[in-house]
């Protein structure tokens, strides 16, 4: 085994899934919000404004969770196979775990909620996000999370609710009826559930409905 790149982060909110890009020439890497980006990025699609420009004062988490974590939070990078070139393509996740490509080579992920925030105005459910170039999904520590209606923050394709995301995979190539071959399958550890997410084009992105599979 050869170490290609040491990443500062680990554990439940560390680096997670690694998959091939559609052209099979590079890798996509997703990491949780306790994982620092490499000190030197070769490219960054996200504007620098997508950092700590909060309009309202922020209240840190009362139990101390992620108090020192700042933008970009969780992230997705495109990486060369030798680990030398890193390009940030999307950020603002809490703890997205799996990555999956649909039949059109579009990238999706399943992001985690902060369960301690449940019932507060700033609670954000687990959700499926369409990982587009330069996208920002607005995770910030404490009460500073960007609502989905902020112009700079993309909305999810679908909110799932409380849970704990693990894997994600499309049914492409499976011996299923067409509807299920096109579905995104997301795994929730908390409730031991696999959901089939049926995505419908909506403008430049998608909206989804869920079905317990």
Q: What residues fall within each predicted segment?
A:
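Beta-propeller domains with acidic blade repeats across secreted/periplasmic ectodomains
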Residues: 1-213
């Amino acid at each position: 085994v050869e170490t290609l790149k040491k990443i500062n982060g680990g554990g439940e909110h560390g680096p997670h899934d690694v998959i091939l890009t559609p052209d099979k020439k590079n890798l996509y890497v997703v990491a949780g919000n306790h994982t620092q980006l490499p000190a030197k990025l070769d490219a960054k699609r996200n504007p620098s404004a997508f950092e700590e420009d909060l309009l309202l004062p922020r209240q840190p988490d009362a139990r101390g969770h992620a108090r020192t974590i700042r933008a970009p939070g969780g992230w997705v990078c495109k990486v060369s196979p030798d680990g030398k070139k890193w390009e940030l393509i999307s950020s603002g996740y809490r703890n997205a775990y799996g990555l999956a490509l649909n039949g059109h080579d579009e990238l999706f992920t399943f992001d985690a909620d902060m369960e301690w925030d449940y019932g507060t105005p700033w609670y954000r459910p687990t959700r499926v996000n369409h990982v587009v170039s330069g996208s920002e999904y607005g995770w910030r520590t404490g009460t500073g999370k960007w609502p989905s209606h902020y112009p700079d923050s993309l909305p999810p394709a679908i909110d799932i609710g409380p849970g704990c995301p693990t894997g994600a995979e499309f049914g492409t190539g499976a011996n299923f009826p067409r509807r299920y071959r096109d579905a995104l399958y997301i795994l929730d550890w908390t409730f031991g559930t696999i959901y089939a997410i049926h995505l419908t084009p909506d403008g430049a992105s998608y909206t989804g409905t869920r079905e317990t599979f």
